[in-house]
Regions:
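Aromatic- and acid-rich polysaccharide-binding/catalytic face
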Residues: 1, 5-7, 45-49, 53-94, ...
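An active-site-proximal structural segment forming one wall of the substrate-binding cleft
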Residues: 1-5, 22-37, 56-66, 130-139
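Active-site groove signature of glycoside hydrolases
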Residues: 1-20, 44-46, 107, 144-152
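Extracytoplasmic/secreted cell-surface and envelope-processing proteins
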Residues: 12-16, 53-56, 79-82, 114-118, ...
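Aromatic-lined substrate-binding rim segments of carbohydrate-active enzymes
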Residues: 17-45, 86-87, 99
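Short, glycine/charged-enriched secondary-structure capping and boundary segments
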Residues: 17-20, 58-60, 85-86, 120-122, ...
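Aromatic-rich peripheral "rim/lid" segments of glycoside hydrolase catalytic domains that contact
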Residues: 62, 117-118, 122-124, 138-182
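Catalytic-core region of carbohydrate-active enzymes that cleave or remodel glycosidic bonds
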Residues: 83-145
Length: 182
């Protein structure tokens, strides 16, 4: 069984070194307690795939020193939520595996929007899915878990609610991204 203590923590912690240090103390305490309850439990913390190569990489590496696995979410998007080409999957997976080192890589969320507003399409989304499966096969057993987030598009009201929740209710691209992941 896997336990991730935190989801996309790099988004919240950013480049705030004291916040990373405080989170590391919390994480190590929570992980220690969880291991006492179930020594067979595999414990990690989830970050975005971008954290492997941005300003958070060193902090995330330190946080993962005591993890049993490295967990990431993977959505190949630009900062404005437009899509990167589906062909980036191979190099992105290699970067994530390299970042994970000898530890297993858990892809807690994987997705690619199909919205034309974001420069995508159903065909691009399908190519992304094919490329993910090919890269997963190529990784051998290094990725024990991969989860596609949303296998269907959600209702516009849900996208609006998520936009408000994330403080991005005025971002048409963010909502187009969320509404076309399925």
């Amino acid at each position: 069984a896997y336990l991730s203590i935190g989801n996309e923590v790099d988004v919240f912690l950013g480049t705030n070194a004291p916040a990373w240090a405080a989170y590391q103390r919390f994480y190590e305490d929570a992980a220690g307690h969880a291991r006492q309850l179930d020594p067979s439990l595999k414990i990690g913390v989830t970050a975005t795939a971008d954290a492997a190569s941005n300003a958070a990489a060193a902090s995330l590496t330190a946080l993962n020193r005591t993890s049993d696995f490295v967990a990431m979410t993977y959505y190949p998007l630009n900062a404005d939520f437009t899509v990167r080409p589906p062909s980036t999957v191979v190099s992105d997976m290699q970067k994530m595996l390299s970042f994970a080192g000898a530890k297993p890589l858990v892809l807690q969320e994987v997705g690619y929007p199909a919205s034309t507003q974001l420069g995508s399409s159903d065909a691009a989304q399908a190519a992304f899915v094919r490329n993910v499966f090919q890269a997963w096969d190529s990784a051998g057993g290094r990725i024990p878990l991969l989860n596609f987030f949303l296998l269907h598009d959600v209702a516009p009201a849900q996208c609006e609610a998520w936009g408000s929740y994330y403080g991005l209710s005025n971002s048409a691209n963010f909502k187009a991204y969320l509404c076309s992941l399925g």
